[in-house]
């Protein structure tokens, strides 16, 4: 039952984060890449190749969706695509984090899916606090926050994907080196989670602050053309 709940949460997570062009593809590619790299160095070549094959399947969607080939195409992931990706990610992570000789520690899995997981939990908690359904739509996701701060949808895609890649890299390095104990990595993840939740809770204030910083940077650049 616990595995079933985890699987369902991750599937819904993938569906909820699919809010702007290419975002689900970018975030899922980061998760598959991080998982595949760890599995490859652990000698789990079959599962690693499965992860890399998923990236190869997702990449054309990202390129067409973002117009990277010179023209934008209306390519939609849809509920079927997003739920299939979420199911595949959670299946691989559950397969590789359980048992006595698991190649990936459970806390590393949290870092691998950090951004989608944080976004889903923070949003669902906020909705429940307001007496709303946790699955009711709103405009408080991370991409809404970034676009409210004055960024375009493509810039939001790049920023969120880079943030996800950075967090996943932390997990990969920690898993590969084994220098930092798992309990420390869990505390660090919870601190990152708290910071994310703080920003989401004060989304309007954060957006205004970012706008002010961007305006100051523009004014400074305009006054100093050289």
What is each PLM-predicted segment?
Residues 2, 224-225:
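N-terminal cationic leader/targeting segments used for protein routing and processing
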Residues 1-7, 11:
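Single conserved hydrophobic/aromatic residue that forms the stacking wall/gate
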Residues 13-16, 145:
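Residue-level recognition of specific faces of alpha-helices
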Residues 23-149, 153-222:
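Alpha-helical transmembrane segments
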Residues 16-24:
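RNA/tRNA-interacting regions in translation and RNA-turnover enzymes
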């Amino acid at each position: 039952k616990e595995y079933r709940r985890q699987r369902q949460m991750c599937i819904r997570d993938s569906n909820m984060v699919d809010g702007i062009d290419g975002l689900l593809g970018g975030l899922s590619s980061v998760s598959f890449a991080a998982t595949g790299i760890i599995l490859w160095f652990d000698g789990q070549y079959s599962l690693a190749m499965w992860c890399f094959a998923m990236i190869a399947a997702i990449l054309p969607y990202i390129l067409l969706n973002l117009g990277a080939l010179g023209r934008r195409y209306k390519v939609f992931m849809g509920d079927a695509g997003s739920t299939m990706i979420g199911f595949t990610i959670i299946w691989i992570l559950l397969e590789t984090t359980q048992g006595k000789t698991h190649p990936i520690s459970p806390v590393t899995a949290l870092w691998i899916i950090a951004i989608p997981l944080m976004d889903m939990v923070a949003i669902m908690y906020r909705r429940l606090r307001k007496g709303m359904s946790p699955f009711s739509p709103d405009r408080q996701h991370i991409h809404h926050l970034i676009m409210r701060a004055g960024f375009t949808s493509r810039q939001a895609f790049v920023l969120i994907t880079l943030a996800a890649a950075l967090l996943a890299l932390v997990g990969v390095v920690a898993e590969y080196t084994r220098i930092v104990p798992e309990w420390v990595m869990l505390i660090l993840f919870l601190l990152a989670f708290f910071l994310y939740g703080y920003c989401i809770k004060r989304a309007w204030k954060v957006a205004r602050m970012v706008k002010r910083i961007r305006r100051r940077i523009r004014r400074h650049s305009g006054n100093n053309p050289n």
